[in-house]
């Protein structure tokens, strides 16, 4: 995959996160660059989690996997340190959220393996380029995300509900969004559901499980995409002894280009 010089906006964003000066959501940050979800697990369960991602490519499209104990990800960009280059992390112990630090270097171990998973923020650039509105960017907030009643395909101990992100669109725009996002299978691809949220187990569209609620205007329908926060719902269900993820909406900004993610 092609990536940009280290002097680009993506590298600067990582340095800002590393220095503790970037702590908010990364939507629309470093335009043109692929952003990634994160899951870090001990090596003894990493093989099962790899199979989980392979069996669930819509919510968990793998971009890279680190070597055990190695925080570098050279295939994704220059000088990446997965322990510090994300604005906010989540630390899980026995399936319970134990903290949201901005740096996990003090928690790093030689047996930890990092999984970087494609993020829908990449296809949002293509949506904007095609004149499609992205409401959470308009409102300056995080994308709304919901746990659903749709099961994932299990692998070893890893199983749990699919998490989806939502963007409200008019019907004609929703059709165009399907066409646009279908070109990006490595960053979740086409929607998994349109319309009635109750059909996928969402009781209240105005109360997302992650992120922020956004306005749904008259004439719009909710459009749902598989989401890379799915591993966090799986962590809650599986309750591994130790796990680190990104905080929802707080991604690793890579040097990879969104334009290189398209398949057509």
Swiss-Prot record:
Coiled-coil residue windows? none
Q: What is its EC number?
A: 4.2.1.-
The answer to whether keyword Lyase applies is yes
GO MF: lyase activity
Organism domain of life:
Bacteria
Cross-referenced Gene3D superfamilies: PSTPO5379-like, PSTPO5379-like domain
Record's Pfam families? D-Glu_cyclase
Against InterPro entries, the record matches this protein to: D-Glu_cyclase (IPR009906), Putative_hydro-lyase (IPR038021), UPF0317 (IPR016938)
Keyword field: Lyase
Q: Which PANTHER family match?
A: D-GLUTAMATE CYCLASE, MITOCHONDRIAL
What's the family?
Belongs to the D-glutamate cyclase family.
Q: What is this protein called?
A: Putative hydro-lyase Bpet2233
Task: Tell me the classification of the organism that encodes this protein.
Answer: Bacteria, Pseudomonadati, Pseudomonadota, Betaproteobacteria, Burkholderiales
